């Protein structure tokens, strides 16, 4: 137990100092901040023109779909790097576990492709 405390003490000190610095900076900003909002500063548009349309315009769902697919495959790469580094010392369970993971992602990618989620036309 004492060995673990010696190993992780620098990390705990770093996290404590980072948290303390963040709290000090937030409190300093709250104390020093100027609070005199006038109607011009809190208006939606500071350019002087009134809004022509509603600010909430429709956004194509395909952009969200592409971003979700990017996150999924980015996580796949994040899991593949440690697996590739320790490939020589993997057990059979770890190897086949990641093969199942890759198979599920491949099936999901094939499904998205077949449904036309990656088509923009």
From Swiss-Prot:
Q: Which PANTHER family match?
A: NADH-UBIQUINONE OXIDOREDUCTASE CHAIN 3
Q: Which GO terms describe its molecular function?
A: NADH dehydrogenase (ubiquinone) activity; NADH:ubiquinone reductase (non-electrogenic) activity; quinone binding
Q: Which organism is it from?
A: Paracoccus denitrificans
User: Can you list the disulfide-bonded cysteine pairs?
Assistant: none
InterPro entries reported in the protein's UniProt record = NAD(P)H_OxRDtase_bac/plastid, NADH_UbQ/plastoQ_OxRdtase_su3, NDAH_ubi_oxred_su3_sf
Instruction: Report what the protein is called.
Output: NADH-quinone oxidoreductase subunit 7
State its location(s). Cell inner membrane
| Similarity comment: family membership | Belongs to the complex I subunit 3 family.
Q: Which UniProt keywords apply?
A: Cell inner membrane, Cell membrane, Membrane, NAD, Quinone, Translocase, Transmembrane, Transmembrane helix, Transport, Ubiquinone
EC number(s) per entry: 7.1.1.-
């Amino acid at each position: 137990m004492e060995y673990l405390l010696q190993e992780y003490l620098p990390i705990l000190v770093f996290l404590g100092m980072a948290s303390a610095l963040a709290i000090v900076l937030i409190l300093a900003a709250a104390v020093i901040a100027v609070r005199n909002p006038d109607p011009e500063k809190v208006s939606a548009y500071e350019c002087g023109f009134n809004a022509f349309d509603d600010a909430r315009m429709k956004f194509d769902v395909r952009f969200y779909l592409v971003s979700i697919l990017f996150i999924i495959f980015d996580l796949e790469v994040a899991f593949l790097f440690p697996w590739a580094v320790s490939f020589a010392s993997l057990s059979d369970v770890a190897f086949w576990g990641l093969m199942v993971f890759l198979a599920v992602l491949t099936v999901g990618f094939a499904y998205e492709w077949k449904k036309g989620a990656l088509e923009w036309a």
